[in-house]
Amino acid sequence: MQLGIILKGIGGFYYVKQEKTEDIFECKPRGVFRKNSVTPLPGDRVGFSIIDGDKKLGNIDEILPRSSELVRPAVANVDQIAIIVAAKAPNPDYMLLDKLLITAETRNIRVLICVNKIDLDDDTAKIVRNAYSPAGYDVIEISSVRNIGYKRLKEELKGHITVFAGQSGVGKSTILNHIMESWVMETGSVSNKIERGKHTTRHAELLELKYGGYVADTPGFSSFEIIDIPYNQLERYYPEFLPYINTCRFNSCSHITEPGCRVIEALERSEIDNNRYQRYIQLYKALKDIPQYKGKKTESRRVIK
């Protein structure tokens, strides 16, 4: 059995890079995967058998254990997420950014926040840095026009499987073309009407970096929902809350209205970004209204920490 990594899957075929030779084989998964409702994903490390060495055809026989799995984008074994926001065109969707950060936190995946197109608006980069640096997130400013940020980004990508995610039209493909030092992805303009990218990525695909590691460009999106987190566990995925949540007066503190809330006190001292905090309240209330949690007592947060 040969070992390899899935680079992409299209129409039921999966393109596997062989570990030893680095040849790429077009493979079909064995029927047992469908029978067990298992779908191979880009990033999966697999065992496969060669059917035709000349034509580079094979069958996927085994999917090795995954260290992580993202649903949207559907990529396995990711250990880093680069979330791309644009300084302008389109304007940043901070709620989407927060949801992506929460998704990464639930899976213990490292995050880079990249602010692209800073040549269009320097102030946005400052806003993002001031809001997210206190939470411990790295913020990288990028501009193709000024050729800024790419050297540092390449250093951060070395040795990782990194997924690029963000709104449509923020310039993910343009960034990838720069860090790959060749044209690898079609880039598209942004529709003025809906501020979404045109002619952009349609599927997740791993691209190998010559200096080590892989990156995955993924279809851009304008909406993203988190529904699998109990509302009283949401606090766990805000790193800037963690120093305070165990010291609130009430064990079941929601950090919204309760007296003696250390998170609110930190907010009042400007140690927590107010806009990000307001979005926390929106997400908390939205999760609380989900039918599976509404009217029910969920597990005590004192137990889950």
Swiss-Prot record:
Residues that, per the record, bind Zn(2+): 248, 253, 255, 261
GO biological process, one term: ribosomal small subunit biogenesis
InterPro entries: G_CP_dom, NA-bd_OB-fold, P-loop_NTPase, Ribosome_biogen_GTPase_RsgA, RsgA_GTPase_dom, RsgA_N
GO molecular function annotations of the record: GTP binding; GTPase activity; metal ion binding; rRNA binding
EC id: 3.6.1.-
Cofactor binding, per record: Binds 1 zinc ion per subunit.
Positions bound to GTP: 116-119, 166-174
Localisation: Cytoplasm
EC class: hydrolase
PROSITE patterns: ENGC_GTPASE, G_CP
Source species, domain of life: Bacteria
Record flagged with keyword Magnesium: no
Domain (CP-type G): residue spans on this chain: 67-224
Keyword vocabulary terms for this entry: Cytoplasm, GTP-binding, Hydrolase, Metal-binding, Nucleotide-binding, Ribosome biogenesis, RNA-binding, rRNA-binding, Zinc
Coiled-coil residues: none
Cofactor entry: Zn(2+)
GO cellular component, as recorded: cytoplasm
HAMAP family: GTPase_RsgA (MF_01820)
Function statement: One of several proteins that assist in the late maturation steps of the functional core of the 30S ribosomal subunit. Helps release RbfA from mature subunits. May play a role in the assembly of ribosomal proteins into the subunit. Circularly permuted GTPase that catalyzes slow GTP hydrolysis, GTPase activity is stimulated by the 30S ribosomal subunit.
Subunit description: Monomer. Associates with 30S ribosomal subunit, binds 16S rRNA.
Family from the record: Belongs to the TRAFAC class YlqF/YawG GTPase family. RsgA subfamily.
Name of the protein in question: Small ribosomal subunit biogenesis GTPase RsgA
